[in-house]
C-alpha cells in the first residue's frame, strides 16, 4: 500500500498592453478595453492511495486520488474576483498479463484533469489576427477525461507490434465560440459547452529490415463525437478520423545516419466547423565524430511543400474559412559537442501550465 500528499501552487501576473499608432502625433497610444492587469492564483491540495499486487505473470494496481482546487482570478477592468473551488476524485486501475517474454496484455482505466491556461481564462480582448479578436472566460471549469484501454504487445526477433483499443470520454469540454463582431471580424470566446467521445484503435510497428535499415509505422483510427450546447444551438456531430506517422532510418556508415519521416492528419470536425487534412514530411542527415562527442546535422522540413490547412467556422450569422499556408521549405543546420559523457542531464520541472503557455 502506498499513500501520499502533494501540494502545488502557482501565480501568474502580467500586463496586457495594446497600442495603436496615432498617425497625427506619430505616437503609440493605449487602446481602451484592450489593456488590463491580470493576477491568477491557484492552489491544488492532493492526497492519494494505491494498492498493488503480483502473482505468476499477472500484476495489478488500483488507486484513488482526490484533489481540491482553489483558483482566484482578478483583473483591473473589474472590481470583483472570479473564484473557483472544487473537489475532484480520480480513480485508476491497471492490470498486466505476461504470457511470455515476447508478448503481454494490458488493460486499464484512468481519470484525468486538464485545467484551462491563461489564454482561455484571461478576460482580455486581443487580436489573434486581422479577422479574429479573442477574449478568455474566467469562469471556465477544468476538463475531466475518462480513459479505458486494452493493449496487446508482441515482439519477434526483428519486428515488434502494439495494438491498443480505447474509449475516451471528456466532460466539461472547452469549445471555441465564434460570433460575428463586424462585417469582416469574428470575436472568439471559450465555454464548457458539452462533451466529446473518441473510440478507436491505435497500431504501431517497428521493423528492423536489415542491420542498416529500420522502419517505424504508427496509425490511429477513431470515431470522434461532439455533443453539447454551443452558443444556444444544440450540437451533435460525428466524424471518422485518422492519423498516420512513419519514419525510416538508414545507417549509411558507422557514424552517418539518414532519416525520413512523414505524418498525416485527416479531416476532422470541430464544434462550429471542420479542419481539413494535413500532410508533412521531412528528411535529416546526422554525422557524429570523436566517439559521438561532436554531432553535426542537416534537416529539410516540408520537403513536398504540403504545409497547407483550411479551418472553416460556421455559426449564426457568421461564416469564416481561413487557409493557413507555409510555402517555404526550411533547411536547419545544427552542431553540438558533449563535454562530459558522465554528466547527468537536469530535468526541468513540468507543469500543466508551462508547456501549453509557452
Question: What is each PLM-predicted segment?
Answer:
Residues 1, 57-60, 102-105, 158-161, ...:
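Repeated loop/turn-to-beta-strand initiation elements of outer-membrane beta-barrel proteins
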Residues 237-358:
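Conserved C-terminal beta-signal and adjacent last beta-strands/turns
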Residues 47-53, 93-97, 140, 150-154, ...:
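Residues on the lipid-exposed face of transmembrane beta-strands in outer-membrane beta-barrel proteins
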Residues 1-61, 98, 196-206, 218, ...:
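Outer-membrane beta-barrel transmembrane domain signature of Gram-negative proteins
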Residues 7-13, 55-57, 66-72, 109-115, ...:
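Transmembrane beta-strands of outer-membrane beta-barrel pores
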Residues 29-36, 137, 141, 156, ...:
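Outer membrane beta-barrel strand-and-loop segments of large Gram-negative receptors
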Residues 13, 42-78, 86-92, 101-147, 167-188, 212-223, 245-266, ...:
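Surface-exposed extracellular loop regions of Gram-negative outer-membrane beta-barrel proteins
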Amino acid at each position: 500500500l502506498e499513500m501520499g500528499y502533494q501540494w502545488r501552487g502557482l501565480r501568474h501576473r502580467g500586463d496586457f498592453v495594446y497600442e495603436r499608432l496615432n498617425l497625427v502625433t506619430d505616437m503609440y497610444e493605449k487602446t481602451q478595453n484592450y489593456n488590463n492587469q491580470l493576477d491568477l492564483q491557484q492552489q491544488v491540495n492532493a492526497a492519494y492511495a494505491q494498492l498493488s499486487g503480483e502473482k505468476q505473470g499477472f500484476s495489478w494496481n488500483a488507486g484513488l486520488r482526490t484533489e481540491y482546487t482553489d483558483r482566484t482570478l482578478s483583473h483591473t477592468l473589474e472590481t470583483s474576483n472570479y473564484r473557483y473551488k472544487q473537489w475532484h476524485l480520480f480513480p485508476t486501475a491497471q492490470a498486466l498479463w505476461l504470457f511470455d517474454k515476447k508478448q503481454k496484455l494490458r488493460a486499464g482505466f484512468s481519470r484525468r484533469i486538464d485545467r484551462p491556461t491563461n489564454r482561455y481564462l484571461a478576460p482580455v480582448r486581443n487580436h489573434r489576427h486581422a479577422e479574429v479578436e479573442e477574449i478568455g472566460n474566467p469562469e471556465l471549469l477544468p476538463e475531466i477525461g475518462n480513459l479505458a484501454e486494452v493493449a496487446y504487445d508482441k515482439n519477434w526477433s526483428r519486428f515488434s507490434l502494439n495494438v491498443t483499443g480505447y474509449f475516451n470520454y471528456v466532460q466539461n469540454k472547452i469549445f471555441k465560440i465564434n460570433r460575428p463582431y463586424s462585417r469582416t471580424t469574428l470575436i472568439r470566446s471559450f465555454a464548457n459547452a458539452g462533451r466529446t467521445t473518441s473510440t478507436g484503435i491505435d497500431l504501431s510497428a517497428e521493423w528492423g529490415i536489415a542491420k542498416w535499415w529500420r522502419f517505424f509505422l504508427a496509425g490511429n483510427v477513431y470515431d470522434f463525437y461532439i455533443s453539447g450546447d454551443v452558443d444556444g444551438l444544440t450540437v451533435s456531430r460525428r466524424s471518422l478520423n485518422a492519423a498516420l506517422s512513419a519514419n525510416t532510418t538508414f545507417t549509411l556508415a558507422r557514424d552517418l545516419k539518414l532519416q525520413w519521416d512523414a505524418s498525416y492528419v485527416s479531416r476532422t470536425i470541430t464544434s462550429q466547423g471542420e479542419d481539413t487534412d494535413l500532410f508533412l514530411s521531412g528528411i535529416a542527415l546526422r554525422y557524429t565524430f570523436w566517439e559521438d562527442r561532436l554531432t553535426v546535422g542537416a534537416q529539410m522540413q516540408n520537403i513536398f511543400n504540403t504545409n497547407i490547412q483550411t479551418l472553416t467556422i460556421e455559426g449564426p450569422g457568421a461564416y469564416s474559412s481561413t487557409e493557413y499556408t507555409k510555402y517555404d521549405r526550411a533547411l536547419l543546420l545544427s552542431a553540438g559537442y558533449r563535454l562530459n559523457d558522465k554528466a547527468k542531464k537536469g530535468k526541468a520541472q513540468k507543469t500543466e501550465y508551462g508547456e501549453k503557455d509557452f
